[in-house]
Amino acid sequence: MDLGTEIKSDTRQEEQRHVFEDYPEPLRYTTWVLRVSIHCEGCKRKIKKILSKIDGVYTTNIDVKQQKVTVIGNVEPEILIKKIMKAGRHAELWPTSMENNINNDCNYQKKPKKDNEETSGDEDDDENNNNNNGGGDVGGGGGGGGGNFDQVKQVVTFVNGQLQPQGDGAPKKKKKKKKKKKSLGNTTVVMEGGGGGGGGGGPPQNDGPPETVIYSAPQDHHIIHGPPPHLHHHQQQNHPYPTVHSPPRHHPQQMYGPGPGLPPPSFYHTQPQTAPSYTVSYNTVHGPINNGGNETASYYTAPPSHPTSYYSYEYVDTGYESPPPEFYSYRSQPSESFESLSEGNPNSCCVM
């Protein structure tokens, strides 16, 4: 009997060893953060009591200052919000760190685009500046090419009411101020003006400020200075087109060389025969002749059939014969203009 009972007890013990105990599954807790309107300690106790009665809530933590409620448990956040809303309190999910990270990523993606646009705009500005600097260098080089000799510049101003330089075609108007440089041999002429300049076919125009003519010569060239330009302007206003009492003695566009022992006029200068030059004159002057024993002279010529200009380019050839003495003789003119232009020299030029 004893043996049988012992065998049974051993088998039972072995069965108990092979039986595995069933352990419960671990709870999956999650943390939810809610924003709840909490005004006082009474609201805090009421919300904590409501949340503790919900199945699956393990712990609750309430921060009154931030109105922040932290719930740890195995429950969905929608259930928590519904329970709190039924109690008459507003509740919503607190923005989590994941959402903040997503927003930060979006902002980070927007910033590089703006930075790229700014950098591209800066590069365009740099390229434009480089192009402008390059153009200035080229222009400076072009200006340096003409500096073979020192230039002596002389400025003469005349009013646009006078006739303009000759030309073929209809009159032209300049809308903007422009500068023109014309190099004639060793002489450089610069014309500035804002009014209407035109060819010989148009009437004189009174639009715009006075025009300025700058012409230069080599440093060793002698320039004779005459009365200031404003005196010439005053004289031309008083006597725009006087009458002519004598026929011309030479062609209007031809000028004589310097006479023996006499100084050349201010608008005239000589050049070597191998390199003829061009000069600028503003009027056509004729010497006096005898008409019936009365010696008369006209300082200006009447406008011919084709319009002429007080501003013209003259060709000078030293091979021509010298003019007669009457060309350099004293010319009678109105007392007012003579007194304003003489300055002790009866043969002084009215322009230079």
Curated annotation (Swiss-Prot):
Q: Which gene encodes it?
A: HIPP36
Gene3D superfamilies with a match to the protein in the record: 3.30.70.100
Q: What is this protein called?
A: Heavy metal-associated isoprenylated plant protein 36
Q: List where Basic residues composition bias occurs.
A: 172-183
**Role played:** Heavy-metal-binding protein.
Q: Give me the residues lipidated as S-farnesyl cysteine.
A: C349
Region labeled Disordered — which residues?
96-150, 162-211, 229-252
Which residues are annotated as modified residue Cysteine methyl ester in the UniProt record?
Answer: C349
Question: What is the similarity comment for this entry?
Answer: Belongs to the HIPP family.
Per the record, where are the segments of Polar residues compositional bias? 97-107
The family database entries (InterPro entries) matched by this protein are listed as: HMA_dom (IPR006121), HMA_dom_sf (IPR036163)
Q: Cite the record's Acidic residues compositional bias ranges.
A: 118-128
Q: Which PROSITE patterns match?
A: HMA_2
Gly residues biased stretches = 133-148, 192-203
What highest taxon heads this organism's lineage? Eukaryota
Q: Which residues form the propeptide?
A: 350-352
| PANTHER family xrefs | F15K9.8-RELATED (PTHR45868:SF80), HEAVY METAL-ASSOCIATED ISOPRENYLATED PLANT PROTEIN 33-RELATED (PTHR45868)
Q: Which GO terms describe its molecular function?
A: metal ion binding
Ordered alphabetically, the record's keywords are:
Lipoprotein, Metal-binding, Methylation, Prenylation
Give residue ranges for domain HMA: 29-92
User: Which Pfam families is this protein grouped with?
Assistant: HMA
Binding site residues for a metal cation: C40, C43
